[in-house]
Amino acid sequence: MVGLGKRLWVEGVGTAWVVFIGCGSIVLNTGAVQQGYGVLEVSLAFGLALVTASYAFGAYSGAHFNPAVTIGFTVAHRFPVRDLLPYIAAQILGAIAAAALLVYVASGRPGFELGASEFAANGFGEHSPADYQLHSALVVELALSFAFVLVSLMVTCRRKLRPIAPLVAGASLMIVYMVSIPVTNGSINPARSTGQALFVGDWALDQLWLFWAAPLLEIGRAHV
């Protein structure tokens, strides 16, 4: 059994990797006309980041990298309650570290303004990429958080599927991001939303509640 300290370190590093690669594909690839790649490319970046992190660190920590996943596994009695809060704290710290590194890198581009770019933060209303309102954002985050956690639970409970579990999880994340990016800029991960919101501040912090509430409301349904 890997010690808790090492597992927390791995969860933090893995979360940082997923957030930096995924959000970096939006923030750092900025042209004069449009910020970031298209929905497909950004979704692929998040999915591949999860696949690589899961294969690299899964044997140590279980490769959650997402508070919603950790809570889902806890509710399903497949993760110890005593480790729940430490895991979530490690994931949030990893996401914040990734966001801080992204700010530092992005600031090297002339004309970069953190507030103006919205920094890949999640939002709804006027802060939705396609101006989707609160009810649309809530439904999308609820449904897709449920689907993603459910897939994670199901694929890891089947021994024969465990070798390909990172691929399935990555593909699932890619699919849910393809749907959610136009609506909320794609969350499905409260840690990812928190890291970006802390640096954007203002509206991003005001709307952060949705990206914690949506996955938490759906966790019970993902119990299998």
Predicted regions and their residues:
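Membrane-interface helix-loop junctions and terminal tails of multi-pass membrane proteins
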Residues: 1-223
